[in-house]
Amino acid sequence: MSELKRTILYQAHLDAGATMVDFGGWDMPIQYPEGIIAEHLYCRRHCGIFDVSHMGRIDVEGPDQVAFLQHVLSSNVLALDLNQAQYCIIPDANGYAIDDAYLYRFEEGKYFLVINAGNIDKDWAHLMNEAKNFDVKLTNVSDKYAAIAVQGPESKKILMTLSGGRQLTPENVKNALNS
């Protein structure tokens, strides 16, 4: 058996008393001493921060990036404005789901696709095979960056505090849920 990969936050998880498990080949926390119900409720009522560094991350660039993404994803890429994300499916040629993913558009001319940790190799092979028919550049940056997800009703307030009051999200977000 191969050794499990560890995120940059591995030691912080241990220091916080996390119970670690094999998750798609990564040594990831499944719960902390307070228990999963308390963690769930805290996130729903306040804010939770999740280490998602194990997820696959792919930069998509090039003249045919939109056509490529329209071809390999189930969602309408053209509906995505700057600083937005959308949930999508990566279907095979018959329309069956290979994986689900999130597509981000952080800047003009560049998209960022986040895929599941356990499917990185399979998804990468599929996307690279499909990319042969497009003028597009795919870069697997999964090992280049750590990543966290900040979720819950107090997320915006906490992010603004951490950023010194800098606005990190657009004021009006399409499809946003407000509490």
Describe the residue ranges of each PLM region.
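Basic, glycine/lysine-rich polyanion-binding surfaces/domains
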Residues: 1-179
